[in-house]
Amino acid sequence: MTLFNPLNSKKRSQQLKQLLDSEKLVILPGCYDALSAKLIEKAGIKAGFMSGFCVSSTRLGMPDTGLISYTEMQDQVRNICNITSIPILFDGDTGWGNAGNVYRTVRGYADAGAAAIMIEDQKWPKKCGHTKGKDVVELDEAKARIKAAADASKLNGDKDILICSHQEA
């Protein structure tokens, strides 16, 4: 058994893109740690999704309201990527702030091995996606976040992580 999986973010993002480009339904079961992600892989499922709600509820017993830090989430990403070979879409919440924070978050997830990251348009600190009264950023800030994520997704001009935009607006 290999402790660390050598697949990098670019290889994983290519795997996920191939799945998404196919004519087949792509199922992304939710995981929250290395074990749950490994169980998804062992079940023969081709990809997964690390949910911020799942991470927050299993680590803190609390809903996804911004209590989990960027560092804690990046640690989860790294642990999951170290033990699995399937591509996983990771919840990047709001990117923990403005466009600069989004850039850092996307690069950090890519460096940890993520195939894809999902960024929300909520204001920081965020509210759980299942609750009412969520505030979203202004259109200019949303555009800046998306641009920052797209810029961060390219290392040396070569895309190495897919970007998904989660819109609450």
Task: List each model region and its residues.
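Hydrophobic faces of well-ordered beta-strands that scaffold small-molecule active sites
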Residues: 27-33, 48-50, 88-92, 117-119, ...
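Alpha-helix-loop-beta-strand connector modules within alpha/beta enzyme cores
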Residues: 8-14, 22, 62-90, 111-112, ...
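Generic hydrophobic/packing signal
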Residues: 84, 88, 92, 96, ...
